[in-house]
């Protein structure tokens, strides 16, 4: 029997049909079209982290592209992990975020900068990353972001998301017209109850729109 609250990880290629269906049930709490969104994310990721209850129900899951990208910027070596679709019902996803970072850090050589990044249009996702990692989370929402974070986000949007900046006035953290899967009305209403100040709101990103914000956390081994 699986211990309630235990974080597990499975390669995407080894997911059973039954487990995928249970992931779909969780995603349906958020999205109007959970099947297409889940299929797209599973094609992009290579690992799924999840917490499964004793009765087999999935309390939360996170699809991850573990070794997403590598590059050298200003003589520093960077490795990127992409945090894809994450949904939670009966379990907090925060411990899963922390487990991904722990596993990722064990693969990094000394001096490597690890970057865990995602794109989002909901303040709850940003808040979850804040709770999981505490510091070195970008964008900060301040008027002036650190130069290194600007360099990293420009690389992420151009090399990974293939959306280069059109002008110097563009916000490098803001991706235009990228999201396909709409939230369901219940989730839109829930997001509307969020009380807090995040860069998502400051950038004018709406949960019922298609713009998203690049969010990332950096750390050095």
Predicted segments — roles?
Residues 21-29, 38, 54-62, 91-95, ...:
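Short linear motifs at secondary-structure transitions and domain/linker junctions
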């Amino acid at each position: 029997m699986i211990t309630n609250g235990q974080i597990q990880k499975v390669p995407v290629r080894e997911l059973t049909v039954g487990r995928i269906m249970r992931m779909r049930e969780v995603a349906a709490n958020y999205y109007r079209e959970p099947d297409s969104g889940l299929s797209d994310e599973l094609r992009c990721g290579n690992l799924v982290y999840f917490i499964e209850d004793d009765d087999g129900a999935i309390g939360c899951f996170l699809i991850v592209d573990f070794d997403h990208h590598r590059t050298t910027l200003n003589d520093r070596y960077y490795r990127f992990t992409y945090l894809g679709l994450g949904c939670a019902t009966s379990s907090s996803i925060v411990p899963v975020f922390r487990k991904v970072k722990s596993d990722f850090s064990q693969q990094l050589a000394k001096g490597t900068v690890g970057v865990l990044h995602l794109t989002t249009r909901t303040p709850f996702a940003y808040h979850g990353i804040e709770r999981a990692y505490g510091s070195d989370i970008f964008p900060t929402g301040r008027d002036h972001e650190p130069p290194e974070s600007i360099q990293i986000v420009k690389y992420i949007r151009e090399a990974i998301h293939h959306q280069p900046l059109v002008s110097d006035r563009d916000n490098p953290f803001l991706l235009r017209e990228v999201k396909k899967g709409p939230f369901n009305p219940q989730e839109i209403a829930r997001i509307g109850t969020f009380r807090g100040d995040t860069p998502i709101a400051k950038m004018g990103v709406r949960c019922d729109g298609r713009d998203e914000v690049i969010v990332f956390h950096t750390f050095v081994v």
